[in-house]
């Protein structure tokens, strides 16, 4: 027994002496956790799953050092580590397959990672300590490179700690390519360029995330001379991007295409035939610029954007009741009627109090509670999806669980109570402030002060939310402006500079980050005037490109680089209104006067199977993904043989019926049908074929109805192109 004890003491003394002389002590937080992360041990598909695997439950990607230390050292009755025989530890034997392991081989015997884990065990398995160096930031170099296929690049990753010391952490960091067809990366940061395109290599270390961007040009950019003469900020910055990617733009769209496009994007409305013909005949070289000003000041502008923001704010009678729904809708209309500054728009919503029936913005706080308000505010006004960080460190962003609850602290003193201001049947709720209420970390119980993502602690003695709004409106903080720019870019181009448009994060970089930053600065400089942004977008030649891709732009199939306009199907509401417009009819909705267009409705609960089939959202989520753009067989059947379309085509006061009663010549009737659907005159061959079909019809009315029906079923009608 004495010999055994003596041997153990000698082993411990020797281990301590050797590590102290030759190496610093292995840190669980800074050395062990990165190894487990690189090996995939704490990933969602392995021991980082909600309930772990094989009896071992680790925190997802190693963001909870204390819990993981307990699990490894004390869990399973201490069988996972052996101080007497470190190499016999299950922590080493399973990942090297010296013991059965369902997760496969994760470590090589004798590798640096294996040696580090063995040393940590031999040194006594020192756990997380206040003496551990606190990690501060991650630097990834190079930031960006334009490469050729087959080229090899080495990523250097440096970590900086709170004591300002730094080290190369490339051997500890984790590397992942976001698109392996463009570039691959190994676990040491060695990148191999593969095929044309652009991607980022995501680098993770101790909760920090960084990226390296690599571009492999598609070819050589051509046809940029005409763009070089344009002073538009957007055009200038896309020229530079096209040069980097080796892409070339399509030609400029026709006047009719442009006119239709700005009406659908800005007003959710088709232009009428008279307007189209007048615009086409106008010889003024500034006519496109003038047309943009007109649409920005049309009353339909208010309808369109009030409806869109009603989607994002979940304006619905199901939760808000009818009075709350109308209150918020009318307030949204006033916002866009008066062209309210968008930073003030955010501020009024986030600091609202009082009766939601009397104060539209207060409805923001009727839906859900503190956590929901936090997630909605972040997603709608910052474009950041915070839901992951509620339970663990965000896996693809530098957002910790503490950041989530620091954000909730802004809303921790907001409360709601029932009110009788509108009578006992009013179901009104009053939003008010309390003097108490804190946010605490769910694991440590620590009280967290109000602090925005990436910002400083911002206290306000009266209303904590004022601190958040002050931070959002700070001219030196582009976060709010970047979100608005990216959202509206997505609405106009069919794809955000960051896509999806409400998923802004470091590992989902913009297709043109310099342009996004420049437009955000420009929006701030112009007092968050959203019409200024839309004016800049629509006046750009990039926006006015044809939706037809040429040989040079065909490589940009998803239109990530805006080499052509991305054709997009009309929304459910736009499509119903467009069908009504083309047919000369009006859909009657319950509880509102005849003449209310679909795009003018306050919520999505007005009965319409047509709009539901075409993807109208239920308004239960703030995610843009709630609106479905997917095509399906029911949509095709509805357009080809549905009762709604047949009814509208044959109505007594329809466009076709008026042609017949007014004895409009067939050639003029054909012209108007084309203008009312495709926003252009028929081409010579189309006109010839239409006249021939009408001559074969049983009567002119039936022939014109068939023509209109056929045009309503074309892609050219259904899509904004």
Role assignments for model-derived ranges:
Residues 20-114, 131-158, 163-231, 260-261, ...:
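Solvent-exposed helix-loop boundary motif
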Residues 28-43, 127, 295-302, 338, ...:
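Short sequence/structural segments immediately N-terminal
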Residues 1-27, 114, 118-152, 158, ...:
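Post-cleavage N-terminal segment of exported redox proteins
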Residues 583-586, 591-592, 597-600, 604, ...:
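Long, His/Glu/Asp-enriched segments that create or flank divalent metal/ion-associated functional microenvironments
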């Amino acid at each position: 027994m004495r010999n055994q004890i003596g041997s153990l003491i000698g082993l411990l003394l020797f281990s301590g002496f050797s590590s102290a002389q030759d190496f610093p002590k292995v840190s669980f937080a800074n050395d062990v956790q990165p190894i487990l992360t690189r090996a995939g041990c704490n990933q969602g598909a392995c021991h980082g799953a909600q309930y772990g695997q094989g009896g071992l439950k680790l925190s997802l990607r190693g963001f909870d050092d204390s819990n993981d230390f307990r699990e490894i050292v004390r869990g399973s009755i201490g069988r996972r580590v052996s101080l007497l025989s470190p190499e016999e530890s299950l922590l080493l034997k399973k990942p090297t397959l010296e013991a059965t392991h369902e997760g496969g081989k994760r470590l090589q015997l004798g590798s640096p990672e294996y040696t580090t884990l063995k040393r940590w065990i031999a040194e006594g398995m020192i756990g997380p300590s206040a003496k551990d160096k606190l990690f501060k930031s991650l630097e990834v170099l190079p930031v960006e490179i334009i490469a050729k296929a087959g080229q090899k690049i080495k990523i250097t990753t440096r970590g900086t700690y709170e004591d300002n010391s730094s080290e190369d952490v490339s051997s500890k960091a984790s590397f992942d390519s976001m698109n392996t067809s463009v570039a691959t990366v190994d676990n040491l940061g060695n990148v191999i360029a593969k095929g044309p395109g652009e991607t980022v290599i995501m680098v993770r270390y101790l909760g920090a995330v960084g990226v390296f961007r690599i571009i492999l040009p598609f070819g050589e950019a051509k046809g940029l001379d005409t763009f070089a003469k344009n002073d538009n900020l957007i055009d200038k910055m896309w020229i530079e991007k096209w040069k980097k990617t080796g892409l070339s733009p399509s030609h400029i769209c026709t006047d009719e295409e442009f006119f239709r496009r700005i009406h659908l994007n800005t007003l959710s409305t088709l232009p009428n035939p008279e307007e189209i013909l007048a615009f086409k005949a106008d010889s003024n070289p500034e006519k496109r610029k003038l047309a943009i000003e007109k649409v920005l000041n049309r009353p339909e502008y208010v309808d369109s954007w009030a409806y869109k923001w009603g989607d994002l704010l979940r304006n619905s009678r199901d939760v808000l009741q009818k009075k709350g729904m109308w209150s918020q809708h009318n307030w949204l209309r006033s916002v866009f009627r008066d062209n309210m500054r968008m930073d003030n728009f955010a501020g009024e919503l986030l600091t609202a109090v009082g009766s939601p029936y009397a104060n539209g913005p207060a409805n923001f706080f009727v839906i859900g509670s503190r956590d929901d308000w936090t997630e909605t505010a972040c997603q709608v006004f910052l474009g950041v999806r915070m839901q992951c960080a509620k339970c663990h460190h965000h896996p693809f962003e530098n957002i910790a669980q503490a950041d989530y609850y620091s954000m909730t602290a802004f809303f921790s003193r907001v409360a709601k109570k029932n009110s009788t201001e509108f009578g006992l049947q009013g179901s009104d709720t009053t939003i008010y402030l309390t003097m108490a209420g804190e946010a605490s970390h769910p694991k440590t119980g620590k009280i967290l002060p109000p602090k925005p993502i990436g910002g400083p602690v911002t206290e306000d003695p009266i209303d904590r939310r004022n601190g958040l709004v002050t931070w959002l409106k700070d001219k030196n903080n582009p976060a709010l402006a970047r979100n608005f720019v990216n959202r509206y870019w997505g609405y106009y181009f069919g794809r955000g500079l960051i896509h999806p448009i409400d998923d802004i994060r470091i590992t989902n970089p913009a297709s043109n980050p310099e342009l996004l930053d420049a437009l955000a600065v420009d929006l701030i400089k112009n007092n968050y005037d959203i019409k200024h942004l839309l004016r800049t977008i629509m006046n750009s030649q990039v926006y006015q490109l044809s939706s037809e891709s040429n040989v040079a732009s065909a490589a940009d199939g998803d239109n990530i680089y805006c080499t052509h306009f991305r054709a997009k199907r009309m929304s459910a509401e736009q499509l119903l209104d467009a069908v009504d417009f083309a047919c000369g009819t009006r859909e009657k909705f319950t509880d509102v006067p005849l003449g209310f267009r679909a795009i003018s409705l306050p919520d999505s609960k007005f009965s319409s199977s047509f709009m539901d089939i075409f993807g109208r959202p239920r308004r239960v989520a703030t995610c843009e993904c709630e609106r479905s753009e997917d095509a399906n067989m029911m949509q095709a059947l509805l357009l080809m043989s549905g009762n709604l379309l047949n009814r509208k085509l044959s109505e007594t006061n329809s466009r076709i019926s008026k042609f017949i009663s007014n004895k409009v010549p067939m050639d003029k009737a054909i012209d108007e049908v084309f203008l009312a659907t495709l926003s252009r005159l028929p081409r010579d061959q189309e006109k010839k074929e239409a006249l021939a079909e009408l001559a074969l019809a049983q009567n002119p009315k039936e022939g014109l109805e068939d023509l209109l029906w056929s045009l309503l079923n074309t892609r050219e009608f259904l899509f904004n192109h």
